[in-house]
Curated annotation (Swiss-Prot):
It comes from Shewanella putrefaciens (strain CN-32 / ATCC BAA-453). Gene3D superfamilies: Anticodon-binding domain (3.40.50.800), Bira Bifunctional Protein, Domain 2 (3.30.930.10), YbaK/aminoacyl-tRNA synthetase-associated domain (3.90.960.10). Catalyzes the attachment of proline to tRNA(Pro) in a two-step reaction: proline is first activated by ATP to form Pro-AMP and then transferred to the acceptor end of tRNA(Pro). As ProRS can inadvertently accommodate and process non-cognate amino acids such as alanine and cysteine, to avoid such errors it has two additional distinct editing activities against alanine. One activity is designated as 'pretransfer' editing and involves the tRNA(Pro)-independent hydrolysis of activated Ala-AMP. Pfam families: HGTP_anticodon (PF03129), tRNA-synt_2b (PF00587), tRNA_edit (PF04073). Its EC number is 6.1.1.15. GO terms for biological process: prolyl-tRNA aminoacylation. GO terms for cellular component: cytosol. It is an enzyme of class 6 (ligase). This is Proline--tRNA ligase. The keyword Transport does not apply. The lineage of its organism: Bacteria, Pseudomonadati, Pseudomonadota, Gammaproteobacteria, Alteromonadales.
Amino acid sequence: MRVSKYLLSTQKETPANAEVISHQLMLRAGMIRRNASGLYSYLPTGLRVLRKVEAIVREEMNKAGAIEILMPMVQPADLWVETGRWDKFGPELLRFKDRHNRDFVLGPTHEEVITDLIRKEVSSYKQLPLNLYQIQTKFRDEVRPRFGMMRSREFLMKDAYSFHLDVDTMNETYEAMYTAYSNILSRMGLAFRPVLADTGSIGGSMSHEFHVLAQSGEDLIAYSTGSDYAANIEKAESPMPTEPRGAATEALRLVDTPNAKTIAELVEQFGLDITKTVKTLIVKGATEAAPLVALIVRGDHELNEVKADKLDLVASPLEMAPEALIRDAIGAGPGSLGPVGLNMPIIIDHSVSVMSDFAAGANVDDKHYFGINWERDLPLAQAADIRNVVEGEPTPDGLGTYAMARGIEVGHIFQLGTNYSKSMNATVLDENGKSQVLLMGCYGVGVSRIVAAAIEQNFDDRGIVWPEAIAPFSVGILPMNMHKSHRVTDIAEQLYKDLSAAGIEVLLDDRKERPGVMFADMELIGIPHTVVIGDRNIDAGVFEYKNRRTGEKQDIPFDQLVDFLKNAVKS
């Protein structure tokens, strides 16, 4: 491709409204342009990268035995009514009526459509298992689209759905998808981690997320320093205490604490060890008999809201009780709450169950109890894992300790079970002629999100540093002053033909432009390999080669360059 016949559209200045580096660089590199909030057009450079990501995803899905189909973006509302998600989904589900006053949605996902398709097309166990996938545009009407392609309203996604009669084949397909996703991200040259994940509102028995590691990632990943164990912070298991509860050495005493509204203030003012304090949070309960529930974690720990949401006594979704309701029930406000004398169900974290001589609010404003001990001052409460893990703690497999990294979720695989097939009556006849509800798996990859995540992991102060497999072009040719030198023009044109004939994707900058601008554009759009041609190089019989990632420069003889670049691109 010649730049003179290409829509390069680079920008020197960073757009003011672009918050994250991927959004900034996709705009500056001429990859995308905004049409409306959360809606973007792909320009040629962006589309080339998107198509390369899409091709790798498609190849690995096909290799794993999945079959490609294509479902409509517009979906009839009656399918969503059938599963109950018409009412459960919030305003992010874009609903509209056609000219006949029939309800439709712009699909944010395709569970309903695929289940409807399978219940009509599959009737016998002999047709199973099946794993069908598509690469299709999705739409979610986000209240505040942010971060460019990282959280846009319209996006490209690969979603696959598998159907089974038995758990064994569902597990086999799940493992195949796990491997396929790992292969996809490995082929793209991205550092990533598969992590155990919460199944969330979708439910199901097993779930993994695939995260591209990046300091800008919204998700916190807890992983083992000694094994492959990794989990989303919401799912990571806290270790059980190994030390027994210490004996009581202090008397229970009521202390005035007028200026200690937080644990940090309490610790600072009274010289306490933060591990000898607890935080009490009041949430709404799941029953009329217990409308409020107290959740208690150690002062240096944080409540894990996803874990808390799964407690039987706690209302789901988890909702913190408002201060007015707390005061009405307890007589004190947040900052002065604790377990002693508290007349409601109490659930403590396992780490709290082994505490002794600890401090907590006294359920009277501006007062705390010091020297609290279980089974002396109050009964030992129900204990559960309700906190976030902490770096340095042992991991559940016993093979290492927790370390933390930030990640961007680009893939998610679920075992759905019968969540959708049961509500939509998707059944087949088994080998005994008996009707059986289908088991389902669901496997999603954010194709357009991978593009943004790759940039978040691969950039420097000059622009994008693409991994080889998804770069828009492999080689950039920079002829210096080619419009003034026939020698430079002739050699640049010949090199362009030779590299193209070798199957290498080349961008030849044939503009009448200053060398500084040409270099800046090549580095901004992230082409992995650049070749500079000038009269001085020609006199020496060499090309000047530069590697975008390492910055390494070297002179390569004319007759060796094509083979050198073939090897560089392959590696």
